[in-house]
Amino acid sequence: MIHYRTIDSPIGPLTLAGHGSVLTNLRMLEQTYEPSRTHWTPDPGAFSGAVDQLNAYFAGELTEFDVELDLRGTDFQQRVWKALLTIPYGETRSYGEIADQIGAPGAARAVGLANGHNPIAIIVPCHRVIGASGKLTGYGGGINRKRALLELEKSRAPADLTLFD
């Protein structure tokens, strides 16, 4: 049985779903990837830890999530999603860089497709992947949401530390 809960956020409603405290989906309203909702049961108290972390993220107080995830997909998708988890807050990578990182040079388009099927948006930060030219391309939640998430992170990313001025 999958339990779900919808919360408000600065980028619109977010639906969290999973079993127990394990998150299997986090999606935005009108997101292109739509998981099957067969056997989903509403639970307004579910995923309170993840909700608290999302609220802290949007407030600029959290840069790394600590949520138990159940990511299901093909082997290639799994490799892409794990690579996304290594992109630091406030930084971006190109689709080609992710392809190279997972040992699949030339597979930038396939990385884009895997990004499009990321079941746990924001926490698995597919919004941090951009075109090789630096252009914002493709995002299941819409380019405006991608831009908003990147701007949030850029505005709150920790400054580089230096020992000497």
Swiss-Prot record:
Its main location: cytoplasm. It holds the Pfam family DNA_binding_1. GO terms for cellular component: cytoplasm; plasma membrane. It is an enzyme of class 2 (transferase). One of its GO terms (biological process) is methylation. One of its GO terms (molecular function) is methylated-DNA-[protein]-cysteine S-methyltransferase activity. Its EC number is 2.1.1.63. InterPro entries: MethylDNA_cys_MeTrfase_AS, MethylDNA_cys_MeTrfase_DNA-bd, MethylDNA_cys_MeTrfase_DNAb, MethylG_MeTrfase_N, MGMT, MGMT_N_sf, WH-like_DNA-bd_sf. Keywords: Cytoplasm, DNA damage, DNA repair, Methyltransferase, Transferase. It is found in: Cytoplasm. It catalyses: a 6-O-methyl-2'-deoxyguanosine in DNA + L-cysteinyl-[protein] = S-methyl-L-cysteinyl-[protein] + a 2'-deoxyguanosine in DNA; a 4-O-methyl-thymidine in DNA + L-cysteinyl-[protein] = a thymidine in DNA + S-methyl-L-cysteinyl-[protein]. The keyword GTP-binding does not apply. The active site is at residue 126. Involved in the cellular defense against the biological effects of O6-methylguanine (O6-MeG) and O4-methylthymine (O4-MeT) in DNA. Repairs the methylated nucleobase in DNA by stoichiometrically transferring the methyl group to a cysteine residue in the enzyme. This is a suicide reaction: the enzyme is irreversibly inactivated. PANTHER family: METHYLATED-DNA--PROTEIN-CYSTEINE METHYLTRANSFERASE. This enzyme catalyzes only one turnover and therefore is not strictly catalytic. According to one definition, an enzyme is a biocatalyst that acts repeatedly and over many reaction cycles. Belongs to the MGMT family. This is Methylated-DNA--protein-cysteine methyltransferase. It comes from Mycobacterium tuberculosis (strain ATCC 25618 / H37Rv).
